[in-house]
Amino acid sequence: MEIKRPLLLISNDDGYQAKGIRQLVEMVSDYGDIIVCAPEDARSGFSCAFSATTPLRLIRRETLTSHLLPLTSVQVWSCNGTPVDCVKMALAEICPRRPDMVIGGINHGDNASVNAHYSGTMGVTLEGCMKYIPSVAFSLCDHRDDADFEPLRPLIREMTAKVLADGLPKGVCLNVNFPLLHTEFSPLEGGVGGGYKGVKVCRMAYGTWGSEVTKCHHPRGYDYWWMVGHYTNDEPDAEDTDRWALDHGYVAITPTQIDLTAYSAMSQISEWFKSNHS
């Protein structure tokens, strides 16, 4: 009986030609058959949005496949929609069977703290998780097009193998963020490969974005705006958070769940209605 190799579905929000997704495919190519379905262009900030009023198209990128890897086990497709559209389209139209794992990334820029809520790469991962497929997002704190992803290789390979072997709890995916290495972050005894101090499983930090809009004036007489903003970590000294881990040279792994219910607030909110609605 033929033993089928695992099937990995990979997407991102930086576009199918981004360096991060190309290197991710190369890093995990020996773990199974790979289908890439990613946006035609950058779709950062699209979170879990999907296209309800726009027709979608898929394009097989044969030349990219041969340029990316000389492997017949890799298919690369682009979609004109959002990152979540890419996952939905791949599951409905491309994948020959249910994927064993969905991977988002590698994202150019971190998705820690509240940034995870805006991230299209996290949208990919949450969509996979909602389909009960073990899903992981990988991001690097470096927005440059030519970012160096090589230091991420050992841990990405280790985590991919672990998730393929053991799966993840139902309704839980992983948000994995790598710090940008600096000379002061030298490897420590017991640290992980790539020069990181180690790995911390941590919670999402509370943070806020301010000064988010910049107004400009066009020479033709009308105003326009750019979304920019400045992020502030509201708890910089909290050592159990993803931002603290990244700021101190650790890889931050945040288990993230589909269930958004604030269970700790249910009793308090229920009290509002006891007198008139009991």
Language-model segments: residues:
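Short, glycine-rich nucleotide/cofactor-binding loops
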Residues: 10-17, 115-116
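Alpha-helix C-terminal capping segments
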Residues: 90-96, 123-134
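Glycine-rich phosphate/pyrophosphate-binding loops
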Residues: 129-151
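Hydrophobic/aromatic beta-strand patches that form the interior of the parallel beta-sheet core
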Residues: 35-37, 77, 103, 136-138, ...
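Short acidic, Gly/Ser-rich segments with clustered Asp/Glu that frequently serve as metal-coordination loops
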Residues: 14-22, 219, 228
